[in-house]
């Protein structure tokens, strides 16, 4: 998969280029990342990429011309039909399903805004989709772009050393992940790993993990549960958990 990054801070992407799964994917030629700095497409001696906002208001706005030229250059490198995604608080919220949707593209151009954003005319002329990573404000689109890239790259075939790691990730089946434990089996204070995980019974371990995924998702993200088509067994697990919770709460109140 090929990524084109439009950013005035291309150096930031060394963090994703040089470390971890992404670095390995680049080394193995499964992914390529090329940055296009809008400052390289300016004509004034100060390499100006922003200006004041028409109508007044605080903050600067990124200029149309340098950004449009950078996008054109990126398209000439990655392909003229490459989708342009603008990382923006006004966009649809990024999630696992959106990652799978974006993964259908062989290449993507990620536009990283700064200041108060980019000239609206650039969005109208060049941007295919706006994506947000959440309802909060960041200084620019570089960190969201890295987040999106990391999410997509780990979903590519053969990028993860163990394909089961991807299948068992949170959100892969619409549920949060189950709890994980490692050595020692018992901490000095006596806090022990659930015995089923030490049993060697893979069927029981799988059942325990499924139960934990359901309970954790019900507790922390009921909105996800509501979107799933649960089996009768899954529904029973959640219902039993709710009954146990009410019963436990009642016992505490009596004390």
From Swiss-Prot:
This enzyme's EC code(s): 2.1.1.228
Which molecular function terms from Gene Ontology are attached? Answer: tRNA (guanine(37)-N1)-methyltransferase activity
Q: Does the keyword Mitochondrion apply?
A: no
Question: Any idea where this protein resides?
Answer: Cytoplasm
Set out the biological process GO terms recorded for this chain's protein.
tRNA N1-guanine methylation
| InterPro entries in UniProt | Alpha/beta_knot_MTases, tRNA_m1G_MeTrfase_C_sf, tRNA_m1G_MeTrfase_TrmD, tRNA_m1G_MTases_N, tRNA_MeTrfase_TRMD/TRM10
| Top-level taxon of the source organism | Bacteria
Q: What is its main location?
A: cytoplasm
Alphabetical keyword list: Cytoplasm, Methyltransferase, S-adenosyl-L-methionine, Transferase, tRNA processing
Which class of enzymes does this protein belong to? Answer: transferase
| Subunit annotation | Homodimer.
Q: Family, per the entry?
A: Belongs to the RNA methyltransferase TrmD family.
Name of the protein in question: tRNA (guanine-N(1)-)-methyltransferase
The record lists the organism as Francisella philomiragia subsp. philomiragia (strain ATCC 25017 / CCUG 19701 / FSC 153 / O#319-036)
Q: Which gene encodes it?
A: trmD
């Amino acid at each position: 998969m090929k990524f084109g990054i439009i950013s005035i801070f291309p150096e930031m992407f060394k963090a994703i280029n040089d470390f971890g799964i992404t670095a390995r994917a680049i080394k193995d030629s499964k992914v390529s990342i090329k940055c296009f700095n809008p400052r390289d497409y300016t004509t004034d001696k100060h390499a100006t990429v922003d200006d004041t906002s028409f109508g007044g208001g605080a903050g600067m706005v990124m200029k149309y011309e340098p950004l449009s030229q950078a996008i054109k250059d990126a398209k000439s490198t990655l392909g003229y039909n490459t989708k342009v995604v603008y990382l923006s608080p006004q966009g649809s919220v990024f999630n696992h399903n959106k990652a799978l949707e974006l993964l259908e593209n062989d290449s993507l151009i990620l536009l990283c805004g700064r200041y108060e954003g980019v000239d609206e005319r650039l969005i109208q002329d060049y941007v295919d989709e706006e994506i947000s990573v959440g309802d909060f404000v960041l200084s620019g689109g570089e960190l969201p772009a890295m987040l999106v890239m990391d999410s997509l790259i780990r979903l590519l075939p053969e990028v993860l050393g163990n394909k089961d790691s991807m299948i068992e990730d949170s959100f892969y089946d619409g549920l949060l992940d189950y709890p994980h434990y490692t050595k020692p089996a018992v901490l000095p204070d006596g806090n022990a790993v659930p015995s089923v995980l030490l049993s060697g019974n893979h069927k029981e371990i799988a059942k325990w993990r499924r139960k934990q995924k359901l309970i954790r998702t019900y507790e922390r993200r009921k909105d996800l549960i509501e979107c799933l088509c649960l089996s009768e067994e899954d529904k029973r697990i959640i219902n039993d958990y709710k009954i146990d919770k009410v019963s436990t709460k009642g016992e505490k109140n009596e004390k």
